[in-house]
From Swiss-Prot:
Signal peptide limits: 1-22
Subunit structure: Interacts with LTBP1.
GO cellular component: extracellular matrix; extracellular region
Disease field: Geleophysic dysplasia 1: An autosomal recessive disorder characterized by severe short stature, short hands and feet, joint limitations, and skin thickening. Radiologic features include delayed bone age, cone-shaped epiphyses, shortened long tubular bones, and ovoid vertebral bodies. Affected individuals have characteristic facial features including a 'happy' face with full cheeks, shortened nose, hypertelorism, long and flat philtrum, and thin upper lip.
Sugar-bearing residue positions: 87, 367, 428, 475, 511, 524, 533, 544, 731, 807
Official protein name in the record: ADAMTS-like protein 2
Residue ranges of coiled coil: none
Cellular location(s): Secreted
GO molecular function: microfibril binding
Amino acid sequence: MDGRWQCSCWAWFLLVLAVVAGDTVSTGSTDNSPTSNSLEGGTDATAFWWGEWTKWTACSRSCGGGVTSQERHCLQQRRKSVPGPGNRTCTGTSKRYQLCRVQECPPDGRSFREEQCVSFNSHVYNGRTHQWKPLYPDDYVHISSKPCDLHCTTVDGQRQLMVPARDGTSCKLTDLRGVCVSGKCEPIGCDGVLFSTHTLDKCGICQGDGSSCTHVTGNYRKGNAHLGYSLVTHIPAGARDIQIVERKKSADVLALADEAGYYFFNGNYKVDSPKNFNIAGTVVKYRRPMDVYETGIEYIVAQGPTNQGLNVMVWNQNGKSPSITFEYTLLQPPHESRPQPIYYGFSESAESQGLDGAGLMGFVPHNGSLYGQASSERLGLDNRLFGHPGLDMELGPSQGQETNEVCEQAGGGACEGPPRGKGFRDRNVTGTPLTGDKDDEEVDTHFASQEFFSANAISDQLLGAGSDLKDFTLNETVNSIFAQGAPRSSLAESFFVDYEENEGAGPYLLNGSYLELSSDRVANSSSEAPFPNVSTSLLTSAGNRTHKARTRPKARKQGVSPADMYRWKLSSHEPCSATCTTGVMSAYAMCVRYDGVEVDDSYCDALTRPEPVHEFCAGRECQPRWETSSWSECSRTCGEGYQFRVVRCWKMLSPGFDSSVYSDLCEAAEAVRPEERKTCRNPACGPQWEMSEWSECTAKCGERSVVTRDIRCSEDEKLCDPNTRPVGEKNCTGPPCDRQWTVSDWGPCSGSCGQGRTIRHVYCKTSDGRVVPESQCQMETKPLAIHPCGDKNCPAHWLAQDWERCNTTCGRGVKKRLVLCMELANGKPQTRSGPECGLAKKPPEESTCFERPCFKWYTSPWSECTKTCGVGVRMRDVKCYQGTDIVRGCDPLVKPVGRQACDLQPCPTEPPDDSCQDQPGTNCALAIKVNLCGHWYYSKACCRSCRPPHS
């Protein structure tokens, strides 16, 4: 009894142990494996557990980041179970992936998409091979909603194919880079891990908060620009997210050079083609319209970081004022304190002194306190503001008006944008001395010292350094800087310089009635409180003069000079041209009187009229929308058919880039999806004649024969008009007599005497080397394709050639072959008579053959052309018959075309349709470059750009 109980306990213990062990292998998160049957107490059930992982597969790429995978299988076993929780299924994934071979590929090699397209070069399509290449450039974001579709096109652009891209193909997934895995674009995080969603912040730090860098933006505008090269800005080493954009379309050309003056592109008065350049350790993308008729802007962008300083140059070709913006991001050194927001300006003498800090006229912190002279080190810009100290800036008074406005913002936030409608004003004014108002307040004595205005800046620049001349010229270059932390309103509206003469009365010629040190008004500001009034007194050797600087313009106490009566002023910006994504705001010059009243433009000098200023403006995010192609022709030429059109979800993803996206986006936006099919009704077909295709011409070369086709009525034969019955036969001419048989070399022998065969290929070719069907050559003279081989001497035996084609194209037929009695004599094949081989042993020369069932294509007559001039379309019905029944078994490879273009006489020239306008925001220039005018969407969105030249 005790022994039986002890044995039973051990049995239960082992069973429970097995169940517990089964539970412990159930791990993982998600599962794509089969589920188990439910377990019932005390019944047979299936236990599941994972097997071992297989070895990692070979990497899908040799470089550039491929994919490798490994699998495991869910194992199962039937066994007795007890009530309670058990191992009901294998949980977790049965396949996992990881990146491999992530090192960069050689820059001069083919891309992975190119390799995949080239692999189709050996494939035969419609009887011939093609040279394939990717349809879109590698750096072009795919317009398809399926980024892991491989789009290839032939070199001549006549054919296209689309197949799933191989695993490891790079793809774009929102703001993450991705890689194709099993036809789906999977993300790669900034940590380099597949399926990771870690992203870079604006400073290029993985999972950073954007606080470790400074964002620098600026505008470059220069009036009365001289011809040749000028420096736009200097970009220090370590910069990332670089963007230089010419905002105003002109003949100017952007160029890029290093600090030593070596040009990477567009240097030495030569224009390079827009493309990607490997510069300073990063890829610099340079783009511009190829001619003046193209839309788009010229720009330079680079992801960075750069490993050396770069100088951005502009080649001015017509002397007009350029308008260029630049921006980049710099990492902040760990020990650097964040710079206080400052406003300051530069002054440069007629001798073109360098921008090394000695020419600083002063700066005003946001809290109103006054500091001494500062160098550009406070900005963390590598001790330089706009260029290398050794470069000739050419910023003298003769250069006219120039503004370099720079926004520097730490923390990765967006800058408020360039000043709106204001800037440095340079005008010539002849007037009388200005006197101060009683409300002018004197400031601290340090404000009158070099701590705010240096002696060079005021005495030398304004008064001529020791001269008591009463005529002087003020024509300064102002560089306004604004940084993060600036108050929402302008800190220093304008500094106006007035002059009081204490040594008797006398008029002064003031060439430039005021100088704006800062005219920046922060965009979208709700408050515009000016900087508190300040003034200062300066004593110079030019006499006992008092110079007051204040922030409010003072009313003139005497008459206004004619030269100062009227001036040009930029209007306020017009509304943004785009309601979503990025648009353009424009400001235009208007003529105003000295008191600010707008007058007719004829009062101002037309030669000094400023050009309009165009700036980008950001709108809200564009909503997805449904786009439809045009309706197709009716599927039938008579009776009831269907019309179809393509319906896709599109969204403006970025300025100039309108792309198809997943339909889920439009559905989530609750946009009503347009219908894709509708019924179309044509006049009733009625009885009509239908014809099969013409038979093959059997005439020999130089001879004539007849080809035939079957004619049938779509209904009862009596109902079709016999007068319109198509002809059922016509004459044909055999091929030219230049066809000749061509043979290849003999292949190896397959065996010994009596069994050995050697084979060669026999072709029928034209005089220019094209291979044509054998029926076009004389079959009586066709060389043998099979010879006996083996020993040097071999007795006579039967040798059969290859079977000829079946004598019918469908159903039951007969095929033939040539059977010869041959021997080998001294290694040479010779033909012998049949009895020497034994007629009873002769292989058959004919055999029954079967082709596909006798389905046959029939077509109706062609319809009228859809147009009376130009290029139209004509159609016909195509049906498959087996006897009198319409079936689906016909060979699709030989199906007759049911739609054909009809090219008639040219249409009369018509004036351009002014209503045909390109959709705003669509990059039509890019659509033309990549041959997308034939695409249904771009033909509509870019209808003006895609018009034929004669229209």
